[in-house]
């Protein structure tokens, strides 16, 4: 279930190159297929955050101009995430990766599953 309007977000996604849209759609379909997952589009309609039991475990921001997807994954060691893509810290918001290689989707889904499973506790 998506909370919040996503028309502008969908326009943003459709401005991305086809391979970026396919990466996003593949990961999105995987995540929303997991039990107890809700999503929310941010206020600027630039990204989608995924929640389990009210706790976020992933955020994806497709970037049409840069031709990559910014992904933030909760609870997975940055060294493990580095196996998929280089971790880049944003000011006040560390541990983002920029995904543009469709060949990394399977590994990324594995890490997202770890983040999803980490959200069963009370953190």
Set out the residue ranges of the language-model regions:
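Charge-dense, low-complexity intrinsically disordered segments
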Residues: 14, 18, 99-102
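A short, surface-exposed helix-loop junction/capping segment
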Residues: 1-16
């Amino acid at each position: 279930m998506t909370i919040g309007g996503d028309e502008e977000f969908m326009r943003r996604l459709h401005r991305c190159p086809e391979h970026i849209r396919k990466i996003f759609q593949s990961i999105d379909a995987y995540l929303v297929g997991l039990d107890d997952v809700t999503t929310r589009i941010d206020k600027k309609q630039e990204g989608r955050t995924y929640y389990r039991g009210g706790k976020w475990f992933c955020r994806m921001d497709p970037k049409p101009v840069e031709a990559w997807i910014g992904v933030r994954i909760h609870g997975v060691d940055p060294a493990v995430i580095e196996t998929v893509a280089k971790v880049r810290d944003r000011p006040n918001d560390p541990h983002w990766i920029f995904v543009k290689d469709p060949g990394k989707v399977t590994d990324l889904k594995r890490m997202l599953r770890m983040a999803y499973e980490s959200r069963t506790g009370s953190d």
